[in-house]
């Protein structure tokens, strides 16, 4: 199963990390897309490490990040700088989507 996680707030980092780890432990793939305040998590080490985990793909809305002055320089190459197209792909490819 592919689990999509749509992150549009920076208030639930612990939940995001826990859900990702639980899904991976069950053998599921995880697709994440961040926008709005969710892009503020990009700079946190705990969040950034998730993209290096096998079975996890991550992207974020560049427009949201720029609008909130979120620094995207130095992000791991595994985190895709994208747009709402990446959100659409996640929603198409995921079997289930959680919004946090």
Name every feature range the model reports, one short phrase each.
Residues 18-19, 45-47:
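A short acidic, amphipathic alpha-helical/loop segment
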Residues 1-2, 100:
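Absolute protein N-terminus
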Residues 3-14, 35-41:
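Short, glycine-rich nucleotide/cofactor-binding loops
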Residues 12-27, 32:
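Histidine-anchored nucleotide/phosphate-binding helix
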Residues 47-71:
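A glycine-rich helix N-cap at a beta->alpha junction
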Residues 70-100:
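C-terminal structural segments of small proteins and small subunits
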Residues 3, 29-30, 58:
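Hydrophobic anchor at the start of a short beta-strand
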